[in-house]
């Protein structure tokens, strides 16, 4: 998802979501009432309509209060991503094995939301 490509955590207001990898590169997702925006260290990457995301069945589900499991079901991208709430407010961190995994996540987002 330039992605949470993330319905990324609770769609009840504005949230910032950080996808961190070992070298601390980060993609930030700002969730608004009707869209969410991906940025990489303040560089604009993409913007998506929340309705489009919420209409993708089976891709996101809440696993417990404040947590979200992203599950890609296409064989090409058969991975699970667990997003866990950190101690700071409205922030979610996705732990990945290496930078290539983060790039894969970005590609998944493009596939899902840009066709």
Task: Describe every region a protein language model picked out.
Residues 1-33, 92, 97, 111, ...:
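Anionic N-terminal interaction surfaces
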Residues 21-24, 28, 32-70:
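Phosphoinositide-binding peripheral membrane targeting modules
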Residues 17, 42-44, 99:
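Short, solvent-exposed aromatic-acidic interface loops
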Residues 54-115:
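Acidic, Ser/Thr- and proline-rich intrinsically disordered linker/docking segments
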Residues 2-4, 49, 78, 87:
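A generic structural signal for short, non-catalytic loop/turn and secondary-structure boundary residues
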């Amino acid at each position: 998802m330039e992605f949470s490509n993330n319905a990324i955590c609770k769609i009840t207001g504005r949230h910032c979501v950080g996808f961190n990898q070992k070298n601390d590169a980060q993609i930030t997702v700002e969730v608004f009432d009707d869209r969410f925006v991906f940025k990489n260290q303040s560089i604009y990457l993409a913007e998506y309509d929340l309705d489009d995301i919420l209409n993708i069945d089976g891709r996101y589900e809440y696993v417990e209060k404040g947590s979200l499991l992203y599950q890609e079901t296409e064989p090409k991208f058969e991975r699970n991503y667990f997003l866990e709430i950190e101690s700071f407010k409205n922030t979610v961190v996705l732990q990945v094995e290496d930078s290539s995994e983060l790039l894969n996540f970005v590609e998944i987002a493009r596939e899902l939301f840009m066709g």
